C-alpha cells in the first residue's frame, strides 16, 4: 500500500518539490533517490512512525520534523529556487516559507550524504508494520 501511495505522489507531485529534493539527494549521495530512499526504514518516504532504524533513517526523521515547522505553504508541494555551488546546495528563495522548505531538503540531503555508509539494504522496502516502537519527539 505504501508503495502505491508513493507512486501516486510521484505522478501527482510532478510540479512540487519532490523532484527538487530527489535531485539534491542524488547530488549528495550518488544514489538514485526514489529507488534508494522512497521506502527506507520507518521514516524515509511518505509518513513515518516508530523509531528510526539507523542514521540514514534518522536523517528522514529529522526531515519530517523540519517539515513540521513549516507554515504558510505545503512543504511537499512547494517549488523553491536553489543551485549547486562548489559541491554545496544553496537555497535562494526570498519567500520565507519556500526558503525554509528548501533548507529542510538541503539539510536532509546533506545528512543522507554524510551517512551514506550506514545505508542498509535490509531497510529498503521496509514494512511500516515493523515500526512499532514508540516514536521519538521532534
Curated annotation (Swiss-Prot):
Keywords: Calcium, Disulfide bond, Hydrolase, Lipid degradation, Lipid metabolism, Metal-binding, Myotoxin, Neurotoxin, Phospholipase A2 inhibitor, Presynaptic neurotoxin, Secreted, Signal, Toxin. Ca(2+) binds at residues 43, 45, 47, 64. Expressed by the venom gland. GO terms for cellular component: extracellular region. Binds 1 Ca(2+) ion. Its EC number is 3.1.1.4. Residues 1-16 form the signal peptide. It is found in: Secreted. Its cofactor is Ca(2+). Gene3D superfamilies: Phospholipase A2 domain. Disulfide bonds join 42-131, 44-60, 59-111, 65-138, 66-104, 73-97, 91-102. Coiled coil: none annotated. Negative results: does not provoke hemorrhage. PANTHER family: PHOSPHOLIPASE A2 FAMILY MEMBER, PHOSPHOLIPASE A2, MEMBRANE ASSOCIATED. This is Acidic phospholipase A2 daboiatoxin A chain. It comes from Daboia siamensis (Eastern Russel's viper).
